[in-house]
């Protein structure tokens, strides 16, 4: 039998209404989460729903915190994690001097794994739980990202960059191989866990 996890805190979320969403705030709220599935099964004012549960175990009271849904970033490039805020007088200069140099490192599986883990840890630290990210033209950059995401049970959307021009030769791939790699990635990762 599944146990629940209980979190008492201020809680903010939105509920769907006719034609939109309405913000809901509980100054002293209770969030009830199924420990097996990780799904929220109840939320409300502590005084309204707290007596309906056995709070003798798996109970955490955050007196100075706010619980809210994770943030979603709809456009990010995880391979550019280490070159964020690098200066370039123009986009092309920035790509040539920083981005393409960094992305070539993702041909190494260990490096791709390392950056995927650093990137995801940074997202979580800042409250972002879902992203839509570009990877690199290397298939292993996508595998590294999805492996790290799956271990954290995060919902992610990602894919392999298909690039056959205007970049260093090491980053370019031909259309046929890129297509085959993309099909393989889709077959391996699509709908796997939260991916």
For each predicted feature, which ranges?
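Divalent metal-coordination and catalytic microenvironments
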Residues: 31, 38, 64, 75, ...
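N-terminal metal-binding scaffold of metallo-dependent hydrolase/deaminase domains
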Residues: 1-53
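A short, small-residue-rich loop immediately preceding and capping a beta-strand
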Residues: 107, 129-138
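Hydrophobic faces of well-ordered beta-strands that scaffold small-molecule active sites
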Residues: 70-74, 131-133, 156-160, 195
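Active-site gating loops and adjacent loop-to-helix segments of metal-dependent hydrolytic enzymes
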Residues: 84-112, 165-175
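Active-site gating/metal-coordination segments in enzymes
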Residues: 96-100, 104, 121-125, 129-130, ...
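Metal-coordinating catalytic core of metallo-dependent amide/deamination hydrolases
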Residues: 140-195
């Amino acid at each position: 039998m599944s146990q629940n996890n209980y979190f008492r805190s201020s809680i903010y979320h939105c509920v769907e209404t006719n034609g939109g969403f309405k913000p809901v705030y509980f100054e002293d709220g209770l969030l009830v989460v199924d420990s097996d599935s990780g799904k929220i099964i109840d939320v409300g004012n502590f005084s309204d729903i707290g007596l309906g549960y056995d709070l003798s175990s798996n109970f955490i009271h955050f007196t100075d915190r706010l619980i809210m849904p994770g943030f979603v970033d709809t456009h990010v490039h995880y391979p550019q994690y280490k070159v964020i805020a690098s200066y370039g007088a123009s986009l092309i200069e920035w790509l040539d001097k920083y981005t393409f140099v960094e992305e070539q490192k993702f041909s190494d599986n260990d490096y791709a794994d390392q950056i995927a883990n650093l990137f995801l840890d940074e997202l979580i630290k800042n409250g972002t739980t879902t992203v839509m990210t570009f990877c690199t033209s290397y298939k292993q950059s996508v595998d590294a990202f999805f492996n790290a995401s799956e271990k954290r049970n995060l919902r992610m959307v990602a894919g392999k960059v298909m690039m056959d021009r205007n970049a260093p030769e090491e980053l370019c791939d031909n259309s046929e191989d890129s297509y085959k790699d993309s099909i393989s990635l889709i077959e391996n990762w699509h709908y796997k866990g939260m991916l």
